[in-house]
């Protein structure tokens, strides 16, 4: 049987300028958010955008977000309550995303808890 860990981190409502979290969430909560229908209209609109600067502005104002690194009173390193034990990796402009995903999933030195392509 696979062992699970209850990681805990802060969840924030859009826009990105909002620095106070509304609650603590875990990996399963984020997974459900990603695969659910809550952000589907925003995701579809974002994927139609041709300009990367327009897309960046849109993401900052239309998507909720979380701080995978831990629980915070406010989104500021000095306001950290507890580190989650997670490390968040963000890869931009990857040519072969399928190959990179497999490398991460099969890596011998760390376990991948959640892996997704952001909108």
Predicted regions and their residues:
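Catalytic phosphate/metal-binding cores of nucleic-acid and nucleotide-processing enzymes, i.e., regions
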Residues: 79, 102-108
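Histidine-centered divalent-metal-coordination microenvironment in nucleic-acid enzymes
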Residues: 88-89, 109-119
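Short loop/turn segments at strand-loop or loop-helix junctions that form parts
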Residues: 7-13, 91-92, 117-118
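Short, acidic loop-beta-alpha module within alpha/beta folds
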Residues: 97-102, 113
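DNA replication initiation on ssDNA origins
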Residues: 1-85
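Short, surface-exposed ligand-recognition loops at beta-strand->loop->(often short) alpha-helix junctions
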Residues: 90-98
């Amino acid at each position: 049987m696979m062992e699970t860990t209850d990681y805990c981190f802060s969840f924030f409502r859009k826009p990105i300028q909002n620095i106070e979290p509304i609650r603590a969430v875990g990996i399963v909560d984020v997974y459900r958010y990603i695969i659910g229908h809550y952000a589907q209209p925003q995701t579809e609109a974002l994927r139609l955008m041709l300009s990367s600067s327009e897309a960046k502005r849109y993401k900052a104002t239309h998507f909720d977000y979380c701080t995978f690194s831990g629980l915070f009173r406010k989104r500021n390193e000095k306001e950290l309550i507890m580190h989650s034990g997670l490390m968040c990796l963000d890869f931009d402009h990857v040519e072969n995303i399928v190959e990179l995903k497999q490398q991460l999933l099969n890596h011998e030195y760390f376990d991948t808890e959640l892996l997704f392509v952001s909108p």
